[in-house]
Each structure stands twice: as C-alpha cells, then as structure tokens.
C-alpha cells in the first residue's frame, strides 16, 4: 500500500518537459529529483551549489519523514555528493526541496537542466521521549565504540 504525500509543482517544466518524481521499478526505494535550473551550471572543484528541484512536498504524517540522498553514480563517477550528506525533510515542512551539491573532485562538473541529481526516500520516524537515569542497565557492549568490535 502506498502512502499519499502531497506534492506541489513549483516549476512548470515538471509534468510537461520532465516527469513527476516516480519509482523507476517496483523495488525502487527512492524517486529521482531533478536539477530545475534556468541554464547549464558548472560546479567548480571544491564548490557547493544549492540546486532547486522544482517541487515541494508536505508529508503531514509525523510518523514519516523524507530524506534526500545522493545518487550513487554521481559521487562515484563524478565526485558530486550532497553538501550536507543527507537532507532531512520533516513531516511539517512545506517549502521547496533544494539539493546541496558539492563537487569533491578535481574537475569542473557540468549540470544540465533537468539532470537527475539526487533521490527522495520516505522513511518511518519514531519520536522518542528521554527518561533521565543515573546509570544504564549493563549490556554486553557497554561503552565500547569507534572500532570496538574490530574489522574481522
């Protein structure tokens, strides 16, 4: 069963020149987001640019959130990653979706109008409530972290 999420088109090219975000296959977890820029853009090495996607979403359900994640080929082949690593879209946010793109390569990267640059994934959210304690119950792991379990 699919959960309905409100989507607002902010750029008229979405739905006419470029498709609405959609799952590419029945097993896809994410929907591609496109660079809805006005002209070709070059992202220089080390530079970060904020790219509009041409859409806004309103998740509305506090048990869900959306995350903007990189497309694997962009980082691996071109050195283009998200400037904030992961973009979190809270259920009550209604503004435009923007993608922060960082060129971590040594070469300029050309972004064309409508290029697919990231993906949108919806995830479940559990809102926790803290319970103050003086000590934790003992666990097998304890305070071990940052390499505590080894590499083998």
From Swiss-Prot:
Catalytic activity: dUTP + H2O = dUMP + diphosphate + H(+)
Cofactor section: Mg(2+)
EC number, as in UniProt: 3.6.1.23
GO BP annotations listed: dUMP biosynthetic process; dUTP catabolic process
Family per record: Belongs to the dUTPase family.
Function: This enzyme is involved in nucleotide metabolism: it produces dUMP, the immediate precursor of thymidine nucleotides and it decreases the intracellular concentration of dUTP so that uracil cannot be incorporated into DNA.
Protein name, per record: Deoxyuridine 5'-triphosphate nucleotidohydrolase
UniProt source species: Shewanella loihica (strain ATCC BAA-1088 / PV-4)
Gene from which this protein is expressed: dut
